[in-house]
Amino acid sequence: MLLEGVKVVELSSFIAAPCCAKMLGDWGAEVIKIEPIEGDGIRVMGGTFKSPASDDENPMFELENGNKKGVSINVKSKEGVEILHKLLSEADIFVTNVRVQALEKMGIAYDQIKDKYPGLIFSQILGYGEKGPLKDKPGFDYTAYFARGGVSQSVMEKGTSPANTAAGFGDHYAGLALAAGSLAALHKKAQTGKGERVTVSLFHTAIYGMGTMITTAQYGNEMPLSRENPNSPLMTTYKCKDGRWIQLALIQYNKWLGKFCKVINREYILEDDRYNNIDSMVNHVEDLVKIVGEAMLEKTLDEWSALLEEADLPFEKIQSCEDLLDDEQAWANDFLFKKTYDSGNTGVLVNTPVMFRNEGIKEYTPAPKVGQHTVEVLKSLGYDEEKINNFKDSKVVRY
């Protein structure tokens, strides 16, 4: 595998940092996940999302933690920190989302250990960045990414309340960015032997994702947009005859208008100077949306899909998460896969969104139980059985 021989130590919880470490594990790195004695907090969150959350079936934990070894260590104890240091001494990459103040209390913040481990890549998820008035504020996907980052406001219908957003969306993009940054630093290490501090914040990830809208806002482009008054009538959503919705994305208005008008049988639009070029259209958007909307109600989504595909015009049907579970395109490309849990039930999980043609997909190793590999890992660090048992008795470790 691509990252065979790379060692990753993960001290994190929930989604953003764990999914980064999982990607590295998916690509062949050895990942050791450190959980507290009680386990990662996401292990008990399934019920909030109507999902199983038992030791025998826990898809929310599984999604972020497959292809890892799991150890359970009390890193607030002196002995636990000692074990952590031994792990870091052998690691190429350290992935964490623990806040800087907490890392400082343990003596493992970047500035405290960079000289001790000069080749270590210290990769950290932050809420709001390293500086500024919010640098110490806890950041979550819902807050730092969606709310403060402007994403919630961008997906609401104008004049309505902010959207109740999809959990984990921003976390996964932040994790993907951290994985990319970590690998760039790993390349530098291969050349120089020197480590690096890599940070990705949820807030910055949102700002980057919203970059087009943020940069155009200074020139008068406003968000949120109403679907009835978008930037272009050919770049919005429409309801079809069967009640399903379609997204048009005809971003080159002048180029595609003629072909589209023929598809919807409204060629008279091309003779109307209010609509037949982009310069005049921008002053009559709502009127043209009504015309197109009436046309789209004449056929079902499947009927429009066939006609638009034949015309080679960009569009897509709007799907739900339930639809995606059965999406033939997703299954054909191995974007999804099935896992049988210890409970005997089979569920669908999502693969990391990067494919390597020659390497293929690594054979999946299920996410660990709490402390499943504690003994194995401690022995590899030189601890004998008696010492490990003493650690367990004093609640330094769990297995």
From Swiss-Prot:
Pfam families tied to this protein: CoA_transf_3
One example GO MF annotation: transferase activity
Superkingdom of this protein's organism: Bacteria
Assembly, per entry: Homodimer.
PANTHER family hit by this protein: E-CINNAMOYL-COA:R-PHENYLLACTATE COA TRANSFERASE LARGE SUBUNIT (PTHR48228:SF2), SUCCINYL-COA--D-CITRAMALATE COA-TRANSFERASE (PTHR48228)
Function summary: Involved in the reductive branch of L-leucine fermentation. Catalyzes the transfer of the CoA moiety from 4-methylpentanoyl-CoA (isocaproyl-CoA) to (R)-2-hydroxy-4-methylpentanoate ((R)-2-hydroxyisocaproate), leading to the formation of (R)-2-hydroxy-4-methylpentanoyl-CoA. Other CoA thioesters, such as acetyl-CoA or butyryl-CoA, are not accepted as substrates.
Name of this protein: (R)-2-hydroxy-4-methylpentanoate CoA-transferase
Organism: Clostridioides difficile (Peptoclostridium difficile)
Lineage: Bacteria, Bacillati, Bacillota, Clostridia, Peptostreptococcales
